């Protein structure tokens, strides 16, 4: 029986979802092990829950990225994979030195090595020479799990053959989200008139939250009874955003919820009219899956990778430019006023949710490593 190892920096709810799905898909035909490098995330405040449903190993308990030298990390990855007699290893963060070293060593030892990523060419301004040199980081990999259209194309640019790129990478358990919400997905559940707009994001520049507040101000100027805007998240821009909302006279309508764990997000979305994601840079946007699990239309920027497969403008949401607050305000007003439109989009969002379900990730793993 082969052993398949899935490695991430730190396990949050989405990683637990994915490993559980792979365990379920393979059954007794493979041993599945999840490895997290560090016991703490240096980016997210999510709960790192105790797990009893699958084998999980933490290489550096109580530590976070940046606290351990790359060579030490690589050596620990290789050592543990050898001890587990891993036949196939899936790794994230191909651009990190430790991952490159570990992937190369594992490939040279005869193991199947695969990368998992959702980077897109349009994530930032690219230098062609640098992109060509970056292909070196992909040499150890025999395949990849990616997302959408643009991320898959980027994997091809990096030298991964088209027929060795599986999808979808960015996935969550739809059942878990709905159970955590404690509510029926829209259009059932909370009445239309009682719903608010919601943004779930870190308070950092690339999330474009200042533009979202500009759009919300424009929306409030034309709405007969403006709905509240809930901001779920935390970060270095919080003080600035609070001050901006106050200066606009919107302090009583903009609700700062703080960082929410998975259950809090699911519950907030259960009372929402729509999710807003106006990022200037967004590799994917996993919260889109959470929103669709709860039947919500999504208004997001065309920079977001999730729009490739999950959002169809005018069908289950709207796509905007990240520098267009007038457009965002227009679509907010449209959903606010037109309950029939909202209900149609809500029903469509619910059907699209399956495209982001964690079962798609398990299918991707099975495409690259067929069960015996």
What are the functions of these language-model segments?
Residues 313-314, 318-325, 333-339:
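Conserved acidic donor-binding segment of nucleotide-sugar-dependent glycosyltransferases
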Residues 242-260:
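Nucleotide-activated donor-binding/catalytic signature segment of Leloir-type glycosyltransferases, i.e.
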């Amino acid at each position: 029986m082969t052993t398949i190892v899935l490695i991430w920096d730190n396990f949050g709810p989405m990683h637990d979802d994915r490993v559980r799905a792979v365990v379920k898909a393979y059954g007794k035909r493979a041993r599945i092990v999840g490895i997290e490098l560090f016991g703490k995330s240096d980016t997210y405040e999510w709960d790192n829950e105790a797990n009893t449903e699958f084998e999980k190993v933490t290489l550096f308990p109580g530590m976070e990225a940046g606290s351990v030298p790359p060579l030490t990390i690589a050596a620990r990855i290789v050592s543990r994979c050898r001890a587990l007699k891993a036949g196939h290893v899936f790794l994230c963060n191909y651009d990190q030195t430790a991952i490159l070293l570990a992937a190369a060593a594992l490939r040279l030892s005869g193991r199947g090595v695969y990368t998992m990523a959702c980077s897109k060419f349009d994530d930032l301004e690219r230098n062609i020479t640098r992109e060509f040199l970056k292909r070196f980081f992909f040499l150890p990999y025999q395949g990849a799990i990616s997302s959408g259209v643009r991320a898959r194309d980027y994997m091809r640019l990096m030298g991964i053959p088209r027929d060795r790129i599986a999808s979808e990478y960015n996935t969550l358990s739809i059942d878990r989200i709905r159970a955590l919400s404690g509510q029926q997905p829209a259009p059932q559940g909370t009445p239309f008139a009682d719903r608010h707009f919601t943004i779930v994001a870190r308070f950092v520049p690339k999330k474009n939250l200042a533009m979202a507040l500009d759009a919300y101000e424009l929306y409030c100027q034309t709405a007969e009874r403006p709905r509240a805007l809930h901001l779920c998240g935390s970060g270095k821009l919080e003080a600035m955003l609070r001050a901006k909302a106050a200066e606009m006279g919107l302090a009583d309508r903009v609700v700062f919820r703080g960082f929410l764990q998975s259950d809090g997000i699911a519950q907030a979305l259960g009372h929402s009219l729509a999710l807003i994601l106006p990022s200037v840079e967004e590799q994917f946007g996993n919260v889109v899956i959470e929103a669709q699990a709860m039947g919500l239309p999504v208004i997001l920027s065309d920079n977001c990778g999730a729009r490739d497969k999950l959002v169809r403008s005018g069908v289950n949401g709207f796509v905007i430019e990240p520098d267009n607050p007038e457009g965002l305000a227009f679509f907010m007003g449209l959903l606010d006023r037109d309950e029939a439109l909202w209900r149609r989009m809500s029903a469509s969002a619910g059907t699209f949710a399956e495209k982001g379900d964690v079962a798609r990730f398990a299918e991707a793993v099975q495409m690259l490593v067929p069960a015996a």
